[in-house]
A protein has these predicted regions:
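Buried hydrophobic packing segments
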Residues: 1-5, 26-29, 80, 148-152, ...
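Active-site-proximal loop->helix
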Residues: 2-4, 14-17, 22-80, 171-182, ...
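A short, small-residue-rich loop immediately preceding and capping a beta-strand
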Residues: 2-29, 33-42, 130-144, 160-163, ...
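Flexible loop/turn segments at secondary-structure boundaries
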Residues: 21-24, 46-48, 73, 101-104, ...
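Active-site/ligand-binding loops adjacent to catalytic centers
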Residues: 77-107, 129, 154-157, 162-253, ...
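A glycine-rich, Thr/Ser-enriched phosphate-binding loop motif common to dinucleotide/cofactor-binding enzymes
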Residues: 103-118, 256-261
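Phosphate/pyrophosphate-binding loops at sites that engage ATP/ADP/AMP, CoA/4′-phosphopantetheine
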Residues: 121-130
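Claisen-condensing/thiolase-fold acyl-transfer catalytic domains that form or cleave C-C bonds
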Residues: 139-143, 147, 237-300
Length: 303
């Protein structure tokens, strides 16, 4: 996207970020390309992901905390779009998920499809075939999930399983399970499923994970769910935390809280011993260590 911005003659790059991973990636490329970089991030997320905030600052980006609304990803996206509308001549907005107005959802999915290309290559080497029986990924806006499934969408042999953020439970009012709770609406220029009240006002989502804390979903995933091409599971905070600790202790891999939701979905599935299951661990857990430490202290069942 930054190469595209350079080709278009833009001088200023803006981005939104929830977990901070997209912000760090954008700041990294801007440092490499010597371009001005401004990252919008909800104040709540700045506090809970401050390691990534410091990385962005080290890379030369300006991080602007957003204090409106719930002070999370939706609000950061609002501010980034507002900035973009005010400075269209010199500014390019690097969207970090399959959300926003066309062509962003399609463009981000295509660029992320390097993930499923890599899955095909690795499966061919490891298993002698290019397709798995199950593909699993977490879904907030839907970028890593889109990349994971991109080359398999039309392959009926592959069961797609998406894990969205159930928060404290989908019936509690503290959730970000958009596919299960959402109704058709428009958010940030995309027609998709949106968590909204009966008046059509967008509800504030909740998730322990900053990257899944979004009241919409990429239109591609809303469509796949409607067509019943994907099985969508809501994974609550407790299930995600437990799965993260399990992976850490069994494999020595500390996953991001977002990815932990995909791991939490494993317990809800029943596989045959011969099934090939590919699960995308979309981020590393360095940024979430403080949350994990806090949660392990309060949840004795994790010990």
């Amino acid at each position: 996207q930054v190469l595209l911005a350079k080709r278009m003659g833009k001088k200023r790059i803006i981005a939104e970020t929830g977990a901070g991973q997209h912000g760090v990636a954008t700041a990294t490329v801007c440092a490499l390309m010597n371009m001005q970089c401004i990252v919008y991030m909800g104040k709540t997320d700045v506090e809970r992901q401050h390691i990534n905030v410091e990385k962005m600052k080290m890379l030369g980006a300006e991080v602007r905390p957003v204090t409106s609304g719930n002070m999370t990803l939706k609000d950061a996206t609002n501010e980034a779009i507002r900035d973009w509308c005010c400075h269209p001549a010199d500014t390019y907005y690097v969207i970090g998920s399959t959300v926003g107005p066309h062509p962003y959802p399609d463009m981000v999915a295509r660029l992320q499809s390097v993930i499923s290309e890599e899955i095909k290559k690795q499966l061919k080497e490891q298993e002698g075939r290019e397709y798995p029986d199950y593909l699993m990924a977490c879904v907030g806006g839907g970028s890593n999930a889109a990349g994971t499934i991109y080359h398999y969408i039309d392959d009926e042999r592959v069961q797609i399983v998406l894990a969205e953020a159930g928060g404290k439970g989908i019936d509690t009012g503290f959730s970000a399970a958009t596919i299960q709770l959402g109704k058709m609406g428009i958010i940030h220029g995309a027609k998709t499923l949106v968590i909204q009240n009966e008046d059509g006002q967008i509800e504030e989502p909740y998730s322990i994970s900053a990257g899944l804390d979004y009241p919409g979903i990429g239109p591609m995933h809303a469509n796949l769910a409607k067509q019943q091409r994907a099985l969508v599971l809501a994974i609550n905070d407790d299930e995600a935390i437990r799965a993260a600790f399990e992976l850490t202790r069994l494999e020595g891999i500390i996953p991001a809280l977002e990815s932990a939701h995909a791991l939490g979905a494993l317990d809800k599935m029943r596989f045959k011993p011969t099934d090939i299951v590919v699960l995308t661990v979309s981020g590393r857990g360095d940024k979430d260590i403080e949350t994990y430490l806090k949660e392990s202290g309060t949840r004795t069942s994790l010990q």
